Amino acid sequence: MKPIKIALIGAGNVGNSFLYAAMNQGLASEYGIIDINPDFADGNAFDFEDASASLPFPISVSRYEYKDLKDADFIVITAGRPQKPGETRLELVADNIRIIREIALKVKESGFSGISIIVANPVDIITRAYRDASGFSDQKVIGSGTVLDTARLQFAIAKRAKVSPNSVQAYVMGEHGDSSFVAYSNIKIAGECFCAYSKLTGIDSSNYEKELEYPVSRRAYEIINRKRATFYGIGAAIAKIVSNIIKDTKNIMIAGANLRGEYGFHGVNIGVPVVLGANGIEKIIEISLNDKEKEKFAKSVAIIDKIYQDAIKNI
């Protein structure tokens, strides 16, 4: 396997959490950091270099310019204005679309041909704006989508069912935000219907929205209200996406993907199950949704599509 080169654009808490997770998992041999503040990028690179001395394998970390992206395998983009306490992700849209468009053009001009992973919020809209501005293929532009929401859901279910999160198959789909929903009809534990665990967990089809969907959707706000930002969880989740692509696992994970007729929608980037492999998103998986879930999915699509369309008219 050839040495992997990963570039981070945006050296804030989320980006640094991803890079630290990636380093400790040995995902790449070379890392580069681009930030609007070159001194900040240098400082983080120096700090990561110091950390690398304790790793059992050699790596390099340095500040990059956009011209250094040409032979990178991955770009992880976290740059954008941060979310404020009490502010929804969708309120960030106008400022962060402007930022991502500028980044997309610089990335394209560099000759980059690898895989772009977008994390900046509101991620569904920002990923779409990046894809449109860059012209890169759907396969190679991946949003973090509801990958963190799904991890939170799996953890919550595992805790109630007294099993490992690795034994839980469950998805949060739709917008990474307030209109996301739990695909309750698809939840399984070790391949068995979640309904078999209703007595143990106290959760069934009549109360899952209160017991699972609502707490999972509010988790980010609970963290932000207490410590102003979330970053370790999403950093680890992005490292998991990158790891699955590098290792060509063909694992099914939730990610932000551009729909081309799947689930009956076109052109919207949204959190859905996908197959991850060496080419990025190798397939979008259309799981069966019940009528209630289909309605929630359509509502989520409509919300992010309207905001995107309104935003690009005014930028």
UniProtKB/Swiss-Prot annotation:
PROSITE patterns: L_LDH. The keyword NAD applies. GO terms for biological process: glycolytic process; lactate metabolic process. Disulfide bonds: none annotated. The modification Phosphotyrosine is found at Y221. InterPro entries: L-lactate/malate_DH, L-lactate_DH, L-lactate_DH_AS, Lactate/malate_DH_C, Lactate/malate_DH_N, Lactate_DH/Glyco_Ohase_4_C, NAD(P)-bd_dom_sf. Catalyzes the conversion of lactate to pyruvate. Homotetramer. This is L-lactate dehydrogenase. It comes from Mesomycoplasma hyopneumoniae (strain J / ATCC 25934 / NCTC 10110) (Mycoplasma hyopneumoniae). The gene is ldh.
